[in-house]
Regions:
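Phosphate/dinucleotide-binding and metal-coordinating scaffold of catalytic cores
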Residues: 1-332
Length: 332
C-alpha cells in the first residue's frame, strides 16, 4: 500500500527516484472510510511464548495497526512519500493459548496517561471509536509540521539501533542492551541528567505496572547536529490484568534490575533493589531513591486523574486491575 512507503525517522530508501517529496499527497477519509480501513487491517500472529517459556508482550509485532495523516483537522490516507502523523492500534485478539488481550487499547491508554500524570514525557494517545472499530490513536513524535505546511520526519533511533544491535535481540536476556548500557549512552545526551533519571524512573514505573515489555526498542533518542536526547515514552502495557494466567517465572522484566544479584523475574524484585540499580546506572543512589519516594507520593493522584480522563467506553475493570497492582507495590 502507499502507506507502506512511510518510515520511522527521517530517512527513506527507495528503489527508484521519487517525485513530489516536497508536497502533501492526501486522500480524505470519512469516519466510515476509517472504520472499513481498520476492519480490513491485516491480522498477524500476535503473542506467544519464547523458547525459554518467558512470556513476552512485543507490541511492535503483536498489535494490528495502521497509520494515517491528520491534516487541517481531518483524517487522510497519505499517498506516495507523504508522512503519516498518527498510528492506529487495534485491540489484540484472543490468542491460541487462551490469553485474552482484547482490552489492550484500554490498557495502553491507561498506562501512558498514568505515566503522563506522574510527570513523564509520553506519546500523546487517545481512544477513538470509528463505527464498531475501537483504536488507540497515537500521535507520532517523529513528525513535525513546518512553516511551509509540509510534514517533516524527525531523525530518531531506538536503543538497539543507537547501540548497533540487531532488533531481534531487543530483550537483554537475548543479548539486547540493558539498563547500564542505555544509561551510559544517555550520559552523553544533550539533556543528560534529566534523560538518565527519566530512564531510571521509567524502569521503576514499569515494575509498578508490571510493564514487562520495556525492552531496548521501546526507548529511543532523537538525533540532530547537536547530539542525541531521549524521545517521549511509548508502547507501555501492563500485565496486571492477566497476571494470574501465567506461572511466576514466566513474568520477567525485559531488562534486569541490578542489585547484589541480577533480577529478571518480576516477583523477585524488591523496593530495596532500586538503590543498587541506580548506582549501577551511573546515578546518585540517594537522590534516585528520593525521586522514587516523591513519585510514590504522587501515585494516588495520578491514578485518580487517569480515571477521570477515561471516556465512557473505557474498560474500567482493566484500569482497576492495573491500579490495584500498582498500589500493591507502592504500599509495601
Amino acid at each position: 500500500s502507499e502507506i507502506g512507503r512511510d518510515c520511522v525517522g527521517s530517512l527513506s530508501l527507495t528503489a527508484e527516484p521519487v517525485d513530489g517529496i516536497d508536497e502533501l499527497k492526501l486522500e480524505a477519509m470519512s469516519h466510515a472510510d476509517i472504520e472499513a480501513h481498520l476492519r480490513n487491517t491485516v491480522r498477524r500472529k500476535t503473542l506467544g511464548m519464547d523458547d525459554d517459556d518467558v512470556f513476552r508482550i512485543s507490541l511492535a509485532g503483536a498489535q494490528e495497526k495502521t497509520a494515517l495523516t491528520l491534516h487541517e483537522g481531518k483524517w487522510h490516507r497519505p499517498l506516495g512519500t507523504t508522512p503519516t502523523t498518527h498510528i492506529f492500534k487495534l485491540p489484540i485478539h484472543d490468542l491460541e493459548n487462551g490469553l485474552k488481550l482484547t482490552n489492550s487499547v484500554d490498557n495502553e491508554w491507561f498506562c501512558l496517561r498514568f505515566m503522563r500524570y506522574l510527570g513523564f514525557n509520553v506519546a500523546q494517545a487517545d481512544i477513538r471509536t470509528f463505527g464498531d472499530q475501537k483504536a488507540l490513536v497515537v500521535e507520532r513524535f517523529d513528525r513535525q509540521q513546518g512553516e511551509d505546511g509540509l510534514i517533516y520526519r524527525l531523525t530518531q533511533e531506538d536503543m538497539c539501533q543507537a547501540l548497533g544491535r540487531a532488533g531481534q535481540s531487543k530483550y537483554e536476556a537475548n543479548g539486547g542492551p540493558g539498563a547500564s548500557e542505555i544509561a551510559n549512552l544517555l550520559r552523553f545526551s544533550t539533556d543528560s541528567e534529566n534523560d538518565m533519571y527519566q530512564f531510571f524512573l521509567a524502569q521503576y514505573v514499569f515494575w509498578l505496572l508490571m510493564g514487562i515489555d520495556g525492552h531496548a526498542k521501546n526507548f529511543s533518542v532523537y538525533l540532530d547536529h547537536t547530539g542525541h536526547w531521549l524521545t517521549p515514552l511509548y508502547d507501555v502495557i501492563s500485565a496486571h490484568p492477566f497476571r494470574n494466567q501465567f506461572r511466576r517465572k514466566e513474568l520477567r522484566m525485559a531488562m534486569k534490575v541490578m542489585s547484589k544479584n541480577n533480577h529478571y523475574i518480576w516477583a523477585d524484585i524488591q523496593m530495596r533493589h532500586w538503590k543498587s540499580h541506580a548506582a549501577k546506572t551511573f546515578l546518585n543512589d540517594e537522590l534516585a531513591m528520593g525521586y522514587i519516594e516523591a513519585l510514590n507520593a504522587d501515585v494516588d493522584v495520578a491514578l485518580s486523574k487517569t480515571f477521570a480522563d477515561a471516556s465512557e467506553d473505557f474498560d474500567k475493570k482493566t484500569g482497576d486491575l492495573i491500579a490495584e497492582g500498582v498500589l500493591s507495590k507502592v504500599r509495601i
